[in-house]
């Protein structure tokens, strides 16, 4: 009975425990994933309570072992979505287990950010993580590999370099592979590196692809070796955070610096952190110098920057010691600023994907943020392409005349449109910009450094513009028909009614176009002065003709306006009006007007273009060149480089190898110097083949990277012979690094040879420095005649003279005579010893 009662109690306890687990599972927290205590405690320590939508969708799939391709907007928690399952799968360090997880990142900064996050989530585990990125010492990375890491976080270029240098390094044990920012990795920029890395991975691996911009067509990722992958795409409609406010500000190219100073000084609060994107590193240097003259201390970051300097600048910005960070696209795709308030696109991004990655830095984790984009007249087509990609309508801000007619009604309608998701673009306050522009121009002209930097940045931007993808033809056409914009709504609060009237008056002066030609004006003057001639008659004829033509033009204009309004009302979606390209008040040609008047049955009409065509085209890897261009055969990076040299190097180059008599394909950013060396992206020169740096480090440190990546204290010591035939692995012993006293055959032979050479040298030193004699006699004694000897044994060779057919040049003072040594031959040399005595010319030394 007791046993039965105990069994009953244990069953009830087990039942209660299972019920508690079910309740926790229904809560939607991390408890429902049944994570181990080490990982779960680290998550709680980090402060996470509920998974984000992308984590809730992907983590159960990853834990089940299937391949996953996931897309979610920037700042949605994608990094934790693949790190938490990785830590749960690996659990703990396995000696002699090799590398079990590999995370590839396109940039060094993103890899460092992932490493920091991995250490925080894996703080309660003993897993070993190594970072392999460019810019760091190769010897230090060899040392990291000898410690037997379980997880490697790397960039493709450096990992490929290490694989080529270290023969014993293998990735066959990798069972968990993550491609972070997969669209950049699988773009044409890293094709060669990834091809070599993927060939060394095991086929029995789990592959994960994560990015903020991924296409739905997984055929573009065939290189990754996906096996029945699960596609998870969140926020496809809202590619940017709904808490992010977008402001598009039109400006002339020469006024962009003035507009930036005004925005930073007057509009953005001094306690808010702002990220400023520019096109090239030359613009970074110019804007940085300009800000310093204005007593503004920014931080900078660009691709060619030294790694240590980059870390210092970014860390100062993260510590809020500086409130501005000026960056390029190349450098910024890994910088994670958790509390960023504003993003300024000083140069409008040429691709919608780049815009999403830029503005995604702000408004993270439930915070609000603002994104300001400067739009020049040349950038208007790119802005329209962007809104096609975002599926958002766009309209100009109301003009000053419209605001003055009914300010309250116009402002209310504009605010309602912005709240409903419509993008409103407008101008800066021109009067304020003009004042700042004049002062900025004086500063640049008075400073030789600023003037030089401005000219350099202008040339760099000209080259940058040549490499930009072109917008779609439809957007170019629509941009020409867009009506004039007014002052942007964000500046309404600082503009008074009197200033609005002045701005309206100035705008009317700018838009004034006289109706009369110069000939008519002269005719009017002649008519007023009562000058006789045909001029007055011409004026009357032109007035009658213009009156008739104006009536016809106004009638046709009203008809076109009615047709355009009816067409816009028939459209179901607000963005389709931009696809058709009709703008209210625009003139339409006959063919286009006829096409607009055709009836389209909403019930039976099937469009040849998908509804999400523009969105998928912008996400596609093949669409990296933009909406308006075809795919190029040349390998072009997703991001345009930030300097002129980098722009030229973004195409794959081939170098003729004279020794191998074949072409060698160089990686992007590499070039061959006159000495046959490759100059890598970091600026370091390296030979085209294996450099041997690993072997030199191996000889110096007496360590090695074993094929199974064992522990450093057990397998990396290379003491003497290392056991029988090098197969028996011994533990750490005292003085294991000391060189063995047992010499092998080569060492004994080398030592004997050195000893024999030493004896020979000493003998020759004693007998007159050796001999160059022989068949022709030397200068002194020795077996073959030497150059000369000592005073007593100068000719001390065979028979105390020269044993050659020709006597030596000089002998000693006692044995050979002063004027020549004795010759044992019947023929005495002319310069050596004679037949019986001294030579004719030989003179003893």
From Swiss-Prot:
It catalyses: ATP + H2O = ADP + phosphate + H(+). Its EC number is 3.6.4.13. One of its GO terms (cellular component) is nucleus. ATP binds at residues 72-79. This is Putative DEAD-box ATP-dependent RNA helicase 29. The keyword DNA-binding does not apply. The Q motif is unique to and characteristic of the DEAD box family of RNA helicases and controls ATP binding and hydrolysis. GO terms for molecular function: ATP binding; ATP hydrolysis activity; mRNA binding; RNA helicase activity. Residues 696-716, 738-754, 806-817 have a biased composition (Basic and acidic residues). A motif (Q motif) lies at residues 28-56. CDD domains: DEADc_DDX54, SF2_C_DEAD. Residues 675-845 are annotated as: Disordered. It comes from the Eukaryota. It comes from Arabidopsis thaliana (Mouse-ear cress). A motif (DEAD box) lies at residues 180-183. Belongs to the DEAD box helicase family. DDX54/DBP10 subfamily.
């Amino acid at each position: 009975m007791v046993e039965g009662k105990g069994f009953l109690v244990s069953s009830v306890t087990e039942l209660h425990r299972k019920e508690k687990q079910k309740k926790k599972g229904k809560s939607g927290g991390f408890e429902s994933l049944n994570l181990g205590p080490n990982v779960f405690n680290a998550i709680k320590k980090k402060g996470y309570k509920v998974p984000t939508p992308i984590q809730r969708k992907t983590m159960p799939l990853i834990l089940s072992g299937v391949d996953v391709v996931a897309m979610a907007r920037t700042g949605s928690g994608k990094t934790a979505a693949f790190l938490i399952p990785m830590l749960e799968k690996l659990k703990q360090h396995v000696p002699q287990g090799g590398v079990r997880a590999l995370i590839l990142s396109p940039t060094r900064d993103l890899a460092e950010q992932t490493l920091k996050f991995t250490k925080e989530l894996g703080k309660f585990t003993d897993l070993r993580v190594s970072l392999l990125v460019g810019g760091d010492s190769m010897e230090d990375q060899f040392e990291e590999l000898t410690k037997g890491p379980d997880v490697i976080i790397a960039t493709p270029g450096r990992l490929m370099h290490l694989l080529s240098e270290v023969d014993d390094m293998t990735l066959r044990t990798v069972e968990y592979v993550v491609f972070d920012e997969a669209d950049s990795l699988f773009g044409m920029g890293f094709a060669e590196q990834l091809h070599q890395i993927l060939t060394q991975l095991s086929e029995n691996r789990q592959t994960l692809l994560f990015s903020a911009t991924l296409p739905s067509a997984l055929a573009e990722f065939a290189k990754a070796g996906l096996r029945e992958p699960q596609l998870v795409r969140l926020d496809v409609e809202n590619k940017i955070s709904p808490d992010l406010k977008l402001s598009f500000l039109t400006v002339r190219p020469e006024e962009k610096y003035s507009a930036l100073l005004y925005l930073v000084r007057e509009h953005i609060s001094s306690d808010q952190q702002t990220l400023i994107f520019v096109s090239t590193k030359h613009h970074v240097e110019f804007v940085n110098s300009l800000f310093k003259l204005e007593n503004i201390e920014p931080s900078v970051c660009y691709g060619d920057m030294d790694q240590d300097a980059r870390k210092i600048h970014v860390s100062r910005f993260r510590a809020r010691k500086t409130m501005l960070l000026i960056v390029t696209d190349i450098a910024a795709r890994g910088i994670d600023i958790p509390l960023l308030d504003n993003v300024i696109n000083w140069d409008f991004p040429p691709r919608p994907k780049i815009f999403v990655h830029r503005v995604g830095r702000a408004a993270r984790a439930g915070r609000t943020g603002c994104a300001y984009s400067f739009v020049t007249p040349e950038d208007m087509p790119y802005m329209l392409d962007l809104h096609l990609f975002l599926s958002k309508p766009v309209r100009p801000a109301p003009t000053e005349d419209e605001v003055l007619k009914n300010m309250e009604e116009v402002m209310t309608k504009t605010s309602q449109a912005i709240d409903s998701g419509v993008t409103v673009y407008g101008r800066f306050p021109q009067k304020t910009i003009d004042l700042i522009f004049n002062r900025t121009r004086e500063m640049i002209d008075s400073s030789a450094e600023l003037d030089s930097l401005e000219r350099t940045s202008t040339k760099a931007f000209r080259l940058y513009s040549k490499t930009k993808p072109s917008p779609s033809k439809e957007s170019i056409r629509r941009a020409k028909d867009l009506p004039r914009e007014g002052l942007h709504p964000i500046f309404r609060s600082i503009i008074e009614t009197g200033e609005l009237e002045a701005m309206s008056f100035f705008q009317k002066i700018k838009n004034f176009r006289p109706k009369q030609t110069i000939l008519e004006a002269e005719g009017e003057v002649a008519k007023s002065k009562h000058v006789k001639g045909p001029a007055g008659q011409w004026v009357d004829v032109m007035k009658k003709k213009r009156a008739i033509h104006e009536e016809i033009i106004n009638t046709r204009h009203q008809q076109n306006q009615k047709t355009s309004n009816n067409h816009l009302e028939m459209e179901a979606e607000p963005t389709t009006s931009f696809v058709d390209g009709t703008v209210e008040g625009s003139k339409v040609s006959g063919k286009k007007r006829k096409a607009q008047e055709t009836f389209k049955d909403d019930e039976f009409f099937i469009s040849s273009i998908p509804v999400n065509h523009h969105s998928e085209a912008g996400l596609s890897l093949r669409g990296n060149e933009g909406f308006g261009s075809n795919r190029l055969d040349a390998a072009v990076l997703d991001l345009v480089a930030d300097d002129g040299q980098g722009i030229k190097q973004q195409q794959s180059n081939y170098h003729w190898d004279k020794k191998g008599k074949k072409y060698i394909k160089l990686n992007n950013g590499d070039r061959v110097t006159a000495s046959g060396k490759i100059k890598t992206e970091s600026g370091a020169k390296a030979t085209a083949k294996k450099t041997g740096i690993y072997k030199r480090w191996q000889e110096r440190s007496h360590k090695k990277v074993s094929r199974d990546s064992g522990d450093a204290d057990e397998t990396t010591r290379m003491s003497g012979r290392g056991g029988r035939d090098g197969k028996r692995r011994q533990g750490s012993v005292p003085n294991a690094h000391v060189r063995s006293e047992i010499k092998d055959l080569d060492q004994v032979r080398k030592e004997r040879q050195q000893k024999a050479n030493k004896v020979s040298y000493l003998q020759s030193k004693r007998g007159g420095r050796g001999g160059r004699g022989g068949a022709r006699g030397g200068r002194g004694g020795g077996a073959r005649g030497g150059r000369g000897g000592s005073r007593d044994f100068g000719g001390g060779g065979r028979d105390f003279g020269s044993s050659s057919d020709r006597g030596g040049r000089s002998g000693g003072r006692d044995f050979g005579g002063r004027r020549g040594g004795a010759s044992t031959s019947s023929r005495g040399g002319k310069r050596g010893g004679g037949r019986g005595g001294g030579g004719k010319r030989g003179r003893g030394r």
